Regions:
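Short, hinge-like loop/turn segments at secondary-structure boundaries
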Residues: 78-81, 100-106, 152-153, 176-181
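Conserved acidic-Pro-Pro-aromatic motif
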Residues: 37, 56-62, 124-202
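S-adenosyl-L-methionine
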Residues: 1-81, 128, 178-181, 188-202
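Glycine-rich adenosyl-binding loop in Rossmann-like folds that engage adenosine-containing cofactors
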Residues: 2-26, 81-129
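Mobile, glycine- and charge-enriched loop segments
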Residues: 33-40, 100-110, 131-142
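Hydrophobic packing residues within well-ordered alpha-helices of enzyme cores
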Residues: 53, 73, 99, 145-149
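Hydrophobic pocket-lining residues within nucleotide cofactor-binding pockets
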Residues: 44, 90-92, 138, 164
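Short "lid" loop at the C-terminus of a central beta-strand within the Rossmann-like core
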Residues: 66-69, 89-93, 166-168
């Protein structure tokens, strides 16, 4: 599959409209953020979310493990000064994985499987102490990404937005596990925006 230019974005030759529609939800998430220093975001996909976030936060750190999406991400937002791009997946600890493309027509419909196409790292590995927003749409891997971010979360108590759509159970953790994990450290659900759940610490 190759990249093509559509509506000013370099994208894999599949539908773009769904991502453009979902990014409009950001306006309902931002009011929960009292500060807007750093946002950690995954998956970066082709850059639509990171670019929009870069207009509101001092620094955007985005992660995208899929090779073709990462190529489009760099082409689309690689020149935006406050966006830091990583060709990595997020998890609980260091490892490696490969991408299983569930639906080739959907550039976000992937899942991680055993392999060595990319590295898996924890957010805590980066040592951030100024994260005000954590936004994760990692196709069922949210639970592991949160486990790998517990130190970071407890340093700055960011607003957390997760896309939870019931597919974490394929990795052994249904959505309830992730919700319970965040509630155990003082977070509550403040809003549900389509499939995104916004958590704020009491």
């Amino acid at each position: 599959m190759s990249l093509t230019s559509r509506d000013g974005w370099w994208v894999p030759e599949v539908a773009l409209s769904i991502i453009l529609r979902e990014v409009n939800d950001l306006k309902d998430m931002l009011p929960f953020c009292k500060q807007k220093r750093r946002v950690v975001q995954a998956g970066g996909n082709i850059g639509i979310w990171p670019k929009e976030l870069s207009k509101h936060f001092d620094s955007v750190v985005t992660f995208e493990p899929d090779a073709l999406n990462h190529q489009a991400l760099v082409m689309n937002v690689g020149d935006v000064e406050n966006i830091d791009i990583h060709n990595l997946a997020l998890g609980e600890k260091y490892g490696a994985g490969s991408m299983d493309h569930i639906d080739p027509r959907n550039i976000g419909a992937h899942q991680i499987k055993d392999g060595d196409e990319f590295q898996i790292v924890s957010i805590d590995r980066f040592g951030y102490n100024d994260v005000d927003f954590l936004q994760l749409d990692v196709e069922g891997f949210e639970h592991f990404a949160i486990l790998g971010a517990m130190e970071t979360i407890q340093k700055s108590w960011p607003v957390i937005c997760l896309e939870l759509k019931g597919i974490g159970k394929r990795y052994g953790h249904p959505d309830e596990d992730t919700i319970n994990l965040l509630e155990s450290i003082g977070y509550t659900i403040r809003s549900r925006i389509h499939r995104d759940i916004v958590f704020v610490r009491n």
